[in-house]
């Protein structure tokens, strides 16, 4: 069994290291050291195909566990984001032109890995009219052609309120439509300066209205300065637009230049969030310190459809 290591050693920097008045990282925030045959097979394939994963770019603490299960979240549209959200480790700036061949390489990788469940996400591409929605749609279509029994989850940006772009993705018929709310309304504009809470809620509502049987999903991070009551209020808002699946995890600052961690939420509090969300009608809830949006994603679609 792999030994437990600090998150900083898998790319998640402990925000207490730069400032002594920030909370000390608790013992329960440990991740397993990445390694193993499957891990290195996935890593090699991503390099060969010149593909990006959010697992690496966002410094996910679960990379070792997920890659050893031969699952990965493909990062479409390059590795440079046009936005500057204060929590995200993905590079910001002027991105390269969209690579129209990327969907083919992703689909080939899904086939090579013999995936039964693929997760597709992307950087924000506010520099192109459809926000890159056509790349999502084409990637879904090619995965369906090459691996017909593979289910597909898309974790999409807000497309800056371009509902035609949303429709383009929905028309490709993903199995799960995920759009993360990320935080509570009070913190939203500081945490995500170029996004709007109500716009994200509207996106999820429109997805449900257009495809009543689609599994919809959202997620948020806690420990960023919100109160537990505000978390419960967001859970209620998401249920109002009939979101099926919810993920809640601990916010971890990539380094001291990002939005600071205000506190470390206890495992007991995460259990309370999960119990409340299930009582409100969510069909599946992942809630825990190391939970990320795509964690155990292959389990969500089946649970949500029952």
UniProtKB/Swiss-Prot annotation:
A Pfam family it matches: LIAS_N
Q: Does the keyword DNA-binding apply?
A: no
Q: What is its EC number?
A: 2.8.1.8
> Which pathway does it serve?
Protein modification; protein lipoylation via endogenous pathway; protein N(6)-(lipoyl)lysine from octanoyl-[acyl-carrier-protein]: step 2/2
Question: Which cofactors is this protein said to need?
Answer: [4Fe-4S] cluster
Locate the residues binding [4Fe-4S] cluster 2. 81, 85, 88
Catalysed transformations (reactions): [[Fe-S] cluster scaffold protein carrying a second [4Fe-4S](2+) cluster] + N(6)-octanoyl-L-lysyl-[protein] + 2 oxidized [2Fe-2S]-[ferredoxin] + 2 S-adenosyl-L-methionine + 4 H(+) = [[Fe-S] cluster scaffold protein] + N(6)-[(R)-dihydrolipoyl]-L-lysyl-[protein] + 4 Fe(3+) + 2 hydrogen sulfide + 2 5'-deoxyadenosine + 2 L-methionine + 2 reduced [2Fe-2S]-[ferredoxin]
Give the EC class as a word: transferase
UniProt-listed Gene3D superfamilies? Aldolase class I (3.20.20.70)
Q: Where in the cell is it found?
A: Cytoplasm
Tell me which residues bind [4Fe-4S] cluster 1.
55, 60, 66, 294
Sorted alphabetically, the Gene Ontology cellular component annotations on this record are: cytoplasm
Q: Which UniProt keywords apply?
A: 4Fe-4S, Cytoplasm, Iron, Iron-sulfur, Metal-binding, S-adenosyl-L-methionine, Transferase
Q: Which GO terms describe its molecular function?
A: 4 iron, 4 sulfur cluster binding; lipoate synthase activity; metal ion binding
Q: Where is the Radical SAM core domain?
A: 67-283
Chief location of this protein within or outside the cell:
cytoplasm
Q: How is the cofactor bound?
A: Binds 2 [4Fe-4S] clusters per subunit. One cluster is coordinated with 3 cysteines and an exchangeable S-adenosyl-L-methionine.
Q: List the disulfide bonds.
A: none
> Where does the source fall among the domains of life?
Bacteria
Sequence similarity: Belongs to the radical SAM superfamily. Lipoyl synthase family.
- This chain belongs to which protein, by name? Lipoyl synthase
Question: Corresponding gene?
Answer: lipA
